[in-house]
Amino acid sequence: MRLQILAVGRLKDGPERDLTDDYIRRASAMARGLGFKGPEEAEIASGGGMDAEGARLLARIPEGARIIRLDEGGENLTSEAFASRLSRWRDDGERDTCFLIGGAEGYAPDVRAAAPQTLAFGVQTWPHRLVRAMLAEQLYRAMTILAGTPYHKA
């Protein structure tokens, strides 16, 4: 199952970019042996308003992909539950799973309709550049949980 992070806006060089890249690299190295590909990250151009950003986001989603929208009102999962869900989707034959990170204005109604499944990292609102790093870390953590390596200590 291919894992994709589709994020509105460009993550500039700096500690958040370094952290995100490090976790993506680490997750990718483990993913291959667990039946996953990626995670891959794609930056969607910001600007033009929520509807324009939404159209660009939707255009990048592979047909038939499972779409998970990152949202402060989304479902909160433990790391173990997140790993289990990824494993179940893989075992159910999902080809692509896309995690969406919206722009500063949020998600257009058509994106919300296309991606009713949501995920949150707590009830707080987080800066988008930190959400990318947090998602990349959770994907890496999920790979370590599924592989049984000692990174995750519950």
Swiss-Prot record:
Residues annotated as binding S-adenosyl-L-methionine: L70, G102
UniProt keyword Lipid biosynthesis present: no
Domain of life where this protein originates: Bacteria
Keywords carried by this UniProt record: Cytoplasm, Methyltransferase, rRNA processing, S-adenosyl-L-methionine, Transferase
GO molecular-function term, one example from the UniProt record: rRNA (pseudouridine-N3-)-methyltransferase activity
Catalysed reactions, as listed in the record: pseudouridine(1915) in 23S rRNA + S-adenosyl-L-methionine = N(3)-methylpseudouridine(1915) in 23S rRNA + S-adenosyl-L-homocysteine + H(+)
InterPro entries hit by this protein: Alpha/beta_knot_MTases, RlmH-like, tRNA_m1G_MTases_N
Subcellular compartments: Cytoplasm
EC number: 2.1.1.177
PANTHER family in alphabetical order: METHYLTRANSFERASE, RIBOSOMAL RNA LARGE SUBUNIT METHYLTRANSFERASE H
Family: Belongs to the RNA methyltransferase RlmH family.
Protein's name in the database: Ribosomal RNA large subunit methyltransferase H
Source organism of this protein record: Hyphomonas neptunium (strain ATCC 15444)
